[in-house]
Amino acid sequence: MKKAILATKVGMTQIFNEDGVLTPVTVLQAGPCVVTQVKTVENDGYDAVQVGFADIREKLVNKPVKGHFDKAEVPYKRFLREFKFENASEYSVKDEIKADIFAAGDKVDATAISKGKGFQGAIKRLGQSRGPMAHGSKFHRHQGSNGSATTPGRVFKGKGMPGHMGSKRITIQNLEVVRVDVENNVILVKGAVPGPKKSLVTLKETVKAAK
């Protein structure tokens, strides 16, 4: 991996391309990210670049993290993430990673925490079928069978049941970068990206490029 950046989700809109085709896009405020540490094989056992994103007040930073930022002589940041760049040696502390690291036509993977839906039933959470809707039916949205009776006499692990839905780390692969606004550090990505507005999104060059 050579390209990655942290961003916040602004929302969705739609744009027309050169052929007049309407395309739904997600607007991402990407960077600028500041390099807070460069890790090397000699010192850390692997090559990586640690970046900070989104300014934060000093009183909201604990002492160990504050010392880390002070050592790097960079502003305090809300998020710290690490990317295993193949070209990590090309970066230095205080360098900035901006939206221009990507270009229109690039394929990226977007990772974020999905929207939380709370406690949901098996129909909404897992797409299970509902029961008969006739007047004499014993249930409509209740779950069906959970397994056999005496044998095995238990519910198997992994059985789909009602429970908490959402708030999971989701990655959408092979999204196309439609447009990059270098001046405002904005990236437009084709399609939807997980998470609510203002949530943190990690953009990386895709690991499964379309053939």
From Swiss-Prot:
The keyword Signal does not apply. Gene3D superfamilies: 3.30.160.810, Translation factors (2.40.30.10). GO terms for biological process: translation. The keyword RNA-binding applies. It holds the Pfam family Ribosomal_L3. Residues 130-154 are annotated as: Disordered. InterPro entries: Ribosomal_uL3 (IPR000597), Ribosomal_uL3_bac/org-type (IPR019927), Ribosomal_uL3_CS (IPR019926), Transl_B-barrel_sf (IPR009000). Keywords: Ribonucleoprotein, Ribosomal protein, RNA-binding, rRNA-binding. One of its GO terms (cellular component) is cytosolic large ribosomal subunit. It comes from the Bacteria. PROSITE patterns: RIBOSOMAL_L3. One of its GO terms (molecular function) is rRNA binding. Disulfide bonds: none annotated. Belongs to the universal ribosomal protein uL3 family. Part of the 50S ribosomal subunit. Forms a cluster with proteins L14 and L19. One of the primary rRNA binding proteins, it binds directly near the 3'-end of the 23S rRNA, where it nucleates assembly of the 50S subunit. This is Large ribosomal subunit protein uL3. It comes from Lachnospira eligens (strain ATCC 27750 / DSM 3376 / VPI C15-48 / C15-B4) (Eubacterium eligens). The gene is rplC.
